[in-house]
């Protein structure tokens, strides 16, 4: 890509020529895994208080027939995408790209399934749009690295808005010029501050759904003739200027070999329902729990990457004593303490009961960190902990990769088992769930995506 080329124009040209049959089988398999996992994560949140809030507000805006996953009643297209995306991201159990901290599944899947229902899209077109959306979002994330977080914003929301717009534009078969307008419109919808880290409030959950519905809205506006700025990504007042570290970026990452090389193949299916970078430390603690007596632990020191500190470690006293269950998911010390005491970590681990458990809190307050300047985050997700016992002995535990990631992926049976476990938190019939699994893994064979959507009720 030359310095004179406009990023959105080049990207639109590349997206517009991608054919479903040219997407490699490995990417197709990953997209199917992400789709099933995303829906399962949304079903796990179906009976939550935040879902009730979302349903109540959508009913105030009128009715619709776009499916809300796990419920009989539907909603308008924007509310359905908002609810499904928010629910899917709600317990932080959703897939995450290994290489930068973005969650494409919970943005792209609800956007495309909602828009696909409205347009009666085929399974092939759905697969194409999903794959494009995942790829755009992961490539955008690789450009920004950790800078969006450092500026105080949530990359899943900011970058997801752009990616869902490209995915929806692909599903609508917009012309390149219309895609450029759609991206320009979407750029004004990018948002999502990370102040939720201070008190565990629900807004992080909302970010995925907001990005999903924004992509639908921006692409439909462009289709109807609305315009947006051409240099919305790389302009002097564009997205990267506003949300990252300026316009001097390597935009080649976004466009080089696009449609030929699919980096989103490295999307990880989460093994634990907590912030992604807590996972290697959880695995260290699961190892340690087999060997140590917690009553003999004086302190635990963790080697960490600097880019994770402001989200998962600081303020340390708050992270050691999280104010609610949601805040606990983004506390490495508390997640580690849960793993040490329970010898496992699942959705049931994050409850008021354990949040007030004195022994778990005592252990969490023994856990501290030191920055390792050689930690490869965000390129690799690793962990090393040093457990100092009252005898003076120090035991070391390490994890060299992310469970569920490219070096240790979950198998298809494991992904299905995770989906089935998440299903137990919803009211979806088992017969519908089994049909859904079959439909997702044969997605490109569906003549109409509404066949799949009917199984979601």
Give the label of every model feature segment.
Residues 28, 32, 36, 108, ...:
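Hydrophobic face of alpha-helices
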Residues 62-64, 136-144, 189-196, 309-311:
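Secretory-pathway/luminal and periplasmic proteins that interact with or process carbohydrate-rich
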Residues 87-147:
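Hydrophobic alpha-helical hairpins/lids featuring a short glycine-rich hinge
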Residues 1-101, 203-213, 220-457:
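Terminal-appendage/accessory-domain detector
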Residues 107-110, 152-161, 165-171, 181-253:
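Amphipathic alpha-helical interface segments
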Residues 57, 129-133, 182-189, 303, ...:
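Short acidic/histidine-centered micro-motifs embedded in hydrophobic/aromatic stretches
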Residues 118-130, 173-180, 228-231, 293, ...:
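Structural helix-adjacent loops and short alpha-helical linkers that scaffold large soluble proteins
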